[in-house]
């Protein structure tokens, strides 16, 4: 298995500086562009309304795990309510800032993948930050309930990197499985990608790894039957 190049050494400081500068630039542009036009939408109010209203009666597990438009969005629920607890609901700016930080993570994952497939580090550093703006500054770039799609995808890419591309250690299996479970917890739509990892292992006859890869899917199945 090819090893990821080290991109934090002295020889790559310029590339890293370019990457983080562009991420900061795009994030700032999005905040400036939408700071007066963003607001909470029906998905947010559903979380703040019915879930919080039933918290005392139905318990914390129902609060986190109850379906939202037929999906598990426990991570989104904790994200919304946690920020509201600290900042209130007068301004959407704290949500926009956290979305920019999360999209930095998405860009970083793509940055690493680009280097892995052989793209020049400087070219990757220039291209990857464009995942911050997602085409013509669409709502996925600043609205949390849509941003979770790309954030979950990034966790699934981390899952694939550790679980499929590096099966040489138990640590890699644990990291890959944990990333998948976290991605599904944030938004369950990414559960559809888990069978891809399992299929790769079955083709390679790596039965133990295929079993480990199935754990997030099994956990999702239990949630689906329970809630």
Regions found by a protein language model. Name each.
Residues 35-40, 55-81, 85-96:
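Membrane-proximal lumenal/periplasmic loop motifs of glycosylation machinery
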């Amino acid at each position: 298995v090819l090893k990821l190049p080290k991109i934090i050494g002295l020889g790559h400081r310029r590339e890293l500086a370019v990457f983080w500068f562009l991420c900061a630039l795009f994030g700032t542009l999005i905040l400036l562009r939408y700071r007066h036009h963003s607001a909470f939408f029906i998905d947010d109010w559903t979380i703040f309304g019915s879930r919080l209203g039933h918290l005392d009666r139905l318990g914390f597990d129902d609060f986190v795990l109850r379906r939202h438009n037929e999906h598990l969005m426990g991570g989104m629920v904790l994200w919304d309510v946690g920020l509201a607890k600290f900042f209130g609901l007068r301004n959407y700016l704290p949500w926009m800032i956290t979305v920019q930080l999360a999209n930095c993570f998405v860009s970083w994952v793509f940055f690493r993948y680009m280097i892995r497939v052989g793209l020049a580090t400087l070219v990757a550093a220039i291209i990857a930050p464009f995942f911050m703006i997602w085409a013509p500054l669409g709502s996925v770039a600043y609205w949390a309930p849509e941003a979770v799609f790309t954030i979950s995808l990034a966790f699934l890419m981390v899952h694939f990197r550790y679980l499929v591309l590096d099966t040489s250690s138990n640590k890699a299996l644990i990291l890959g499985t944990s990333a998948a479970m976290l991605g599904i917890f944030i938004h369950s739509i990414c559960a559809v990608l888990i069978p891809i990892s399992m299929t790769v292992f079955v083709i390679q006859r790596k039965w133990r790894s295929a079993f480990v890869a199935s754990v997030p899917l099994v956990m999702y199945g239990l949630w689906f039957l329970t809630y």
